[in-house]
């Protein structure tokens, strides 16, 4: 029993693979023609990823729970307003703990959409409002395609981000082309391939995780060649862990407080906490590749990678606590109006 309890706190296979890829890029970074090959392969993998997700997501899932507008507004406010405000407000206190480029990555983390898969998975584990979680998390990802580039220009660029394009409109256009267009084509192809994809979850998982690993390898290869680890001292990495921990603690605490303050039931609270406090690695890394210069992506996504692993481990424990609470509590009264 003790070994089983301890295993919940150990990194999963993907986390270990992610660490291995970062180590590989640090020791054997891709350069020259090899780097160009991996960049092209990464672009194709990202397009395939969004194509498959578009084909997997049903129109019913998109529309399910959409009438619960109070919950969705609160989740979107936490994702796209609360996080950027926290990032800017904490900068005078937490900024000196890390390098300016790393805190630019923290601000980029703050303007990203919520993660989809883990938010829904943790909501299910905790016995929360699943239809609302599917709707909120999916809508957050789609809205992030439009909102995140605008927030990057407002929040991140004034802090010194190295952007790859000369205008946010150009960045939005490239995100639409590389991310949204494959998603829409995939969704339009759903009548033809939707059932095939649903029966092959392992394929989607492989493409999902494989595309992230490719982006991480190419991003960190470019960053290492530009001297990433020489520019970031060990003290800054330790400071970054503290920054991510403080940000996650505040996000979890404030989403819980607001859910209870506005009178949501426990199922809705679970959805708000897990959808409103999480940030998407799957969306964030491709967006960083599009929005920022290649040599800057490694440092930009490092805070996101640390925050992502931290939120997975913390939310796994939190979801189990919610599940035990739901198992021992009486069934909640039905709500007459939403």
Q: Whereabouts are the PLM-identified features?
A:
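Alpha-helical transmembrane segments of multi-pass small-molecule/ion transporters
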Residues: 1-338
């Amino acid at each position: 029993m003790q070994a089983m309890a301890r295993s919940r706190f150990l990194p999963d296979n993907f986390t270990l693979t992610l660490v291995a890829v970062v180590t590989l890029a640090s020791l054997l970074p891709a350069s020259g023609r090899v780097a160009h090959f991996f960049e092209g392969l990464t672009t194709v993998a990202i397009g395939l990823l969004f194509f498959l997700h578009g084909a997997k997501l049903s129109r019913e899932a998109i529309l399910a729970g959409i009438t619960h507008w109070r919950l969705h507004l609160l989740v979107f406010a936490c994702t796209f307003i609360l996080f950027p405000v926290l990032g800017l407000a904490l900068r005078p206190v937490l900024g000196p703990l890390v390098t300016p480029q790393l805190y630019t990555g923290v601000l980029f983390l703050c303007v990203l959409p919520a993660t989809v898969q883990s938010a829904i998975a943790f909501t299910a584990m905790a016995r929360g409002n699943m239809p609302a979680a599917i709707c909120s998390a999916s809508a957050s990802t789609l809205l992030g395609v439009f909102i995140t580039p605008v927030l990057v220009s407002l929040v991140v660029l004034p802090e010194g981000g190295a952007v790859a394009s000369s205008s946010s409109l150009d960045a939005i256009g490239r995100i639409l082309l590389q991310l949204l267009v494959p998603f829409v084509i995939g969704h339009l192809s759903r009548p033809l391939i939707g059932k095939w994809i649903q029966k092959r979850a392992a394929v989607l998982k492989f493409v999902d995780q494989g595309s992230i690993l490719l982006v991480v390898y190419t991003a960190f290869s470019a960053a290492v060649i530009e001297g990433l680890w020489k520019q970031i001292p060990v003290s800054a990495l330790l400071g970054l862990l503290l920054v991510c921990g403080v940000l996650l603690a505040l996000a979890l605490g404030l989403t819980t407080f607001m859910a209870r303050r506005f009178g949501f039931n426990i199922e809705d609270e679970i959805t708000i906490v897990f959808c409103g406090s999480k940030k998407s690695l799957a969306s964030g890394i491709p967006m960083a590749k599009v929005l920022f210069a290649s040599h800057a992506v490694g440092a930009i996504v490092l805070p996101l990678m640390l925050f992502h692993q931290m939120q997975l481990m913390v939310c796994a424990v939190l979801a189990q606590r919610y599940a035990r609470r739901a198992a021992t509590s009486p069934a909640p009264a039905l709500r007459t109006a939403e």
